[in-house]
Amino acid sequence: MRLETTRNFLFASAAVLAFASPAFALDGADVLKKMNAAYHVQGAEITAKSVATNGDNVTLSGVVIGSGMDPAQQFPIGNVTLEGVEEDNGGYTIEKMSFENVNYAKEKVAITIDDLYMTGVVVPADATANTVDAMLFYDEAHTGPASVKIDGKEAFSIAESNATMTKSEDGGTLSFDLTAEGFKGDLSGVTDPKSKEAIDALQLKSLSGDLTVNGSWEVAPGTINVDEYSIDVENVGRLDMSFSISGYTMAFIKSMQDAVKAQEANPNKEQADQAFGLAMLGLMQQLTFNNAKISFDDAGITKRGIDYAAKEQGTTSQQLSQMIKGMAPMMIAQLNIPELQNAVSAAVNTYVDDPKNFTISAAPAKPVPFPMIMGAAMGAPNTIPSVLGVTVTANQ
């Protein structure tokens, strides 16, 4: 009796598992399909030689990412491991997506990237929906040391990079951050004598610095605020940029993607490029300029630049500085912008005498539609500074 009961229990358990397994089994092929759909909207494509599923983990083997069928645009990235994959209303969430170290070589160029991964990845159920939920998101994308070698010599490297994305609770705003720490550039391999002379004089043979980007995107009005886009190069200076535009909505993005697809699908390249240009011109009509700013904080490059230019012209640095200060008002006068002429001249004089920082800002009293800017550029270029509220300052 006990044996019969045990046997019935085992049969019942097996039946339950048999019926339950398909409902809970993870479909690795569908995960890849949904990921590919999200990338395809952006003009990219992912292929894998095989897909293996083990519990809530998926392994994609022989992965290649690229655009179209052109072999030149295909980039093999090896195996990709997806950990903690869960189905979510037709889409998927992935705790961590890990990539093999990149070791790519073609002709004279070799690229290596270590410690690549993404966390908090959200794969949309329907990448064609015209909502923010149709986009592929991640909490963090990370790379470790990366290097580019040309003819066996390292030309560029980065110690580490991190990119993060954060969605507000109501889904109305997306914030983003990007840092690339410890990048290095080696220009010692330049062979052209004149260029090599300039690089040596400007002390640019070896460059090192950091890149920082952060901002936000308000989805409904399509307002992109890039609060900081800075490149800080040691012994050269720090370039800071920021801007804000509106109109970059989901509808705008879809129209832009459709234009790109149409361009790629047209075999007549000249005709495709012309149609794409007209499409972009039309889309620009939907954008609005809010503000922008660009500034440079000097760390020695200005003086070295003046010294080198003076030597090339057979004069002294002091004489060249005076020439620059004298020429600035005349050059600005040719643009017929009297309200900006004095400000530019004063800023140039101040900066050349004591290079600290130089800033150009555009802050109109109210947002300016791009068509108005384009109209001013074609009809009355000298009115653009007043239309955009341009100011120029130095050492402030």
Label each PLM-derived region with a short phrase:
Residues 26-396:
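Glycine-rich, small/hydroxylated-residue low-complexity segments
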Residues 1-25, 362:
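Gram-negative bacterial Sec-dependent N-terminal signal peptides
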